[in-house]
Structures are given as C-alpha cells and as structure tokens.
A protein has these predicted regions:
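C-terminal catalytic "cap/lid" subdomain
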Residues: 4-221
Length: 221
C-alpha cells in the first residue's frame, strides 16, 4: 500500500484490514516507503547513507498517513505511531501506548522503521511484532509467497508452502533480510508471506487458511 496506488487500491486494502478487525483481531501495521525513496539508493545518488535512510523513514510516514486516512474512512479507528518525533502529525512510538491502543480496538500503523539508520522495514516489522506480543508476523507482498528465486523473472521458480527460518538463511532467500529472520527465529515468531493483491488473502491468512508461505522453526514443520 503506497501513496502512488490508485484510490481504489488503497480503499480495497483498507477494507481488507477492516474485515480482519471485525474478527476481533488486534492489528499493528509496519509500513514501508520504498515507493517514494529507499535509503539504500542514497550512496548511488551521492547522498550519505544515514541521510538517505532518514529520508526513507519520512517516506514511510507519508504512507502511514495515507493508510490511517483510508482506515478511518472505512469506520476503523486508527493511530499512527512514529519512531521519529513528529508530534504535530503522529504520536511518538511507545510500546505500552501501542498495546493500549490495540486493546482499545484501534489499528496502530507504525511509521519511520526502527528510528535508526541501517535497519530495514522488515527488521522494524519483526521488532514491533515482538514488542507488542504479536502471535504472527504477516508480510503482505506482491508475490504469492516464498520461491527459490524471483518468480517474476524465472517462470520455473519453485514455490515453498512452508519453510524453516534456517533454510531461508542458508539458501539466501529474499523473504526478509537476515536480521529480521534471525529476530523471528530467536523468538519463535512465525511469518506468513502472502500476496496482498489477491482479494481476501490477508483474512484467509489470519483464519489459518493455506495462502502463501509460512516460515517457522524446523521442529514445527
């Protein structure tokens, strides 16, 4: 979900989240900003990496505000919490406040990553999931799950319905970055990777239906 998506796409995603919320599920969302700017591009553009990463964090804030607005228009209470202080437009992130908002039925949208350079949105998602005591980390992406190589480039790419954290790391699969996967592995937090563009995939994943790929420990496969 990003600000360059059509209003219809943004609205559809907001309604998917609403459907899940109506199941009684507490939802925290970590949003990226790669559609606007990626800090990793900074050095190629002659920009200091740290500066570039902060630019990327601000991009996530823009996307978070768009999503918050879309959610509110569906009738869902939502709050943006930012890892960087931007008091006029978002609350500062504090895990106890985030948990309180979740318990009150609000969707919390986490912006600005971890608030530190050199950490990806994936790592921020793993960190926030652990901090709020999430049962599962759902990575919504543009492909159907985890493959042995890029399915958009290789038509014969092999799909995994489930895979262990350690296999993701050993095979160098581009599910999430190594830091994020390691955090999930060390804390036994399952990850579901699914295609956000397919209607009701998010809801199906939450209900435990087989959509996408589940990444978990070897002993639970």
């Amino acid at each position: 979900m990003c600000i360059r998506d059509s209003p219809e796409t943004v609205r559809d995603i907001a309604f998917q989240i609403k459907d899940i919320k109506e199941l009684g599920v507490e939802i925290g969302i970590v949003i990226g900003g790669g559609n606007i700017y990626r800090g990793m591009r900074a050095e190629k553009q002659g920009i200091d990496r740290v500066t570039g990463d902060y630019m990327g964090m601000l991009a996530t804030l823009m996307n978070a505000l768009v999503l918050e607005d879309a959610l509110k228009k569906t009738g869902i209470a939502a709050r943006v919490q930012s890892a960087l202080q931007v008091e006029k437009i978002a609350e500062s992130y504090f895990n106890k406040k985030a948990i309180e908002d979740l318990e009150k039925g609000r969707v919390v949208v986490f912006a600005c990553g971890t608030g530190n350079p050199f950490f990806t949105t994936d790592t921020a998602a793993a960190l926030r999931a652990l901090e709020i005591g999430a049962d599962v980390l759902l990575k919504a992406t543009k492909v159907d799950g985890v493959y042995d190589r890029d399915p958009e480039v290789h038509s014969d790419a092999v799909f995994f319905s489930e895979i262990s954290y350690i296999d993701v790391l050993n095979k160098g699969l581009k599910v999430m970055d190594a830091t994020a996967i390691s955090l999930c592995m060390d804390n036994n937090l399952p990850v579901i990777v699914t295609n956000i563009k397919k209607k009701d995939n998010l809801k199906k994943a939450v209900l435990g239906e087989p959509v996408g790929t589940i990444v978990k420990g070897v002993d639970t496969l």
